Amino acid sequence: MSSGTPSPPTNPTRPPASTVPDRALADLVDHVRTRFYGLYRGVVTDNNDPNSLGRIKAQVPAVFGQIDSGWAMPCVPYAGDQVGIAFLPEVGSGVWIEFEGGDVSYPVWVGCYWRASELPPDVAPSVKVIATVSPFELKFDDDGGSLTITDNNGNTVTLDSSGITLSNGSEQVVVSSSSVSVNNGALQVT
């Protein structure tokens, strides 16, 4: 029998105590290396989802280089059976991409961003604009107290405190609480 400190008993089903934290740390490091958390800039390469779910494919250089992502699910503020907000970014648009659980196999597009020259005109803190490529536009002006709808031919409908104005550029009809005016008073109905 040797003199000195006795050895602790061994348990063949349990690894030595010093390797448990080391293995947990190694697992954590491996997990972090293979997961991508946070927002990544991407560019839409395909928006023609074969399943019509609002999905897109995007190039996300920081994650995939020049290879397209898989189909990225949309993250929208409101969705349900036959209801919701449905906006799909155009091919070439800048999008923010995240990955569900950090797993690159489950991309999610969570929004879009503008490049320097892409911001719609007349945008200010008091003016909210929804604009399409066509261009159709819906403009809310909180300071001016108006709502304007513009179609792709330049025709407008404006609702404000003075009434409703319909215009096609050269002609207009103004409906107020007391009258209807056509072409700046050429015809007036009171």
Where are these regions (language model features)?
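Hydrophobic packing positions characteristic
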Residues: 2-175
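Long terminal segments
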Residues: 177-190
